[in-house]
Amino acid sequence: VYESIMKLYAEQGIIRFKVPDDGKWSLLVFTLCFSGGTIRGIHFGEDDGEPFAPLSADLLNPDAVSAFIEITHERYYDVLKEYFGSTVIAMFTDEPCILGRNPQKGLIPWTDDFLEWYISAGNEEISLPALWTDCGEKTEQIRRNYRKALDSKLEHAYYRQISEWCEKHGIALTGHPEKSDEIGLLKYFHIPGQDIVWRWVAPEDNKGIEGEHSTMAKCSSDSARHRGRRRNSNECFGCCGPHGIHWAFSMDDMKWYMDWMFVRGVNLLYPHAFFYSVEGEKRYGERPPDVGPNNTWWKYYNLISAYIKRM
């Protein structure tokens, strides 16, 4: 139980523990390590599970995020500054994940100064075992407190910095967080958004009105309304074909998804995707379908674009 947790201290490099009773005790040691998580690279051989997939960065570290902005956003601005605010209207951040993709199992997000951040939010260091083990009735509340502190750290280190950079350079921050129901993390988005993907929302099986993902469109529209933002967005249609056959995604499917989002207050869509080419297996299978020139119903797309434009 929570009340039995004790913090041990090293004396001359040695930690000693004398069992106080005949009960069963566990000794827990917490270690800060790399997650081993990756991101999806832009070249062949750099996707999930592939040998050259780039390692993910520490999104909770403001210095790491600052360096990221310097080598990416600043570079875009150096080359395209004359188009910022006109042709270039926003920067898109796409489901940033703290641990990265496919991290080591059993880890939770952390960074060098997170313990101080966690304690400053009103939590106790001695509560940390509850993040891994059941410590009684306080366990769920401790985990909620941890998640709240984690989200605020991510907001401060990552989203806030990028949002301020975008505002300073005359463009918006848009895109979406990692998970469907993370409405709180939309705080710093000038155009808050979500991602309709993998047919998690669909006309069949009540997927449009039940479950975690059914809140997506309302997350973005409510975030915009509460914060006085004019636009809110959804990336949509990626891997949304029926029965796992994503190239079977039809115009009827597209119409259903658009109506589902529009009726919930979404007023800006990012259709996924318009590919330069679908030649070859890796391109053909890269998060289909193509809703652009490589699709058989491209000649009718003006009907879709006009419908989107009216919203």
Regions found by a protein language model. Give the residues of each.
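Carbohydrate-binding surfaces of carbohydrate-active enzymes
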Residues: 78-90, 94-192, 197-311
